[in-house]
Amino acid sequence: MKLLTLNVHAWLEDNQAEKIAIVAQTIVEKGYDVIALQEVNQLISAPTISQALKEDNYGVMLLRQVNQLVERKYSLFWSNSHIGYDKYDEGIAFLTHLPVYEVDPFYCSQHQQPDSILSRKILGLTLEYQGQLVDCYSCHINLPNAQGENQLDNIRTIVERSQSSNLKILMGDFNTDAITDPQSYQNIKALGLFDSYEMAVQKDTGITVEKAIDGWRNHSEEKRLDYIFLNQAKRVLSSQVIFNGKNKPVVSDHFGLEVELIL
């Protein structure tokens, strides 16, 4: 199973159209089964194309480019989390070419109003892969020290969302640096999660942010903020950082993380 997670920093990047094209071409080349995206923005003022989606939605534009180039078409699932930079619907998304049985958007945070950046929507999908049902979650988590939120309670809400015995895969930006804050990282794993990076046979440094970014303004050092966690130990063939300037051009303030595993 081939997975990709990427915080796309949508419409906050220079040369955004070119960067969308790079991501689309990479999806076509790699043939990921499930792609989790965060900070998938659309202008609040943009014309609507459906009940939730605007015509400039990053996910919509990415999907259209991908599906022009593949035989096995992808579907987009998107949900709004909160208002970003006073002008965007900032959402989370999945692209997948697998059969989808259930779509489950929900807030993992105590804050649940769009006008609060602490409001954190999670998007859950129940997918079928090689005859097995898998629960996948696209996550953009509050910081460990977020005032008014308990990060571990937020993540526990995701882990306990479904009582099924399905494999659960939590993918995304967890705003926790395993390098400089190992205790917060260990606390997340103590919720019953396995880090695919640690289990991978082949891996690189795992660094997904290498400069100071929003939320990490005083932290210019290299960071591992993006993860693919599993609630069951599986054979992970590889964990590779992508869109980092070495493995594909940079397309966001975060690098992507691609993981291949055997179910």
PLM regions and their residue ranges:
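Active-site regions of metal-assisted phosphoester/phosphodiester hydrolases
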Residues: M1-V34, Y74-L263
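Short loop/turn segments at strand-loop or loop-helix junctions that form parts
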Residues: L6, Q38-N41
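Metal-dependent catalytic neighborhoods of phosphoester/phosphodiester hydrolases
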Residues: Q16, V40-N67, G84-D89, I179-I188
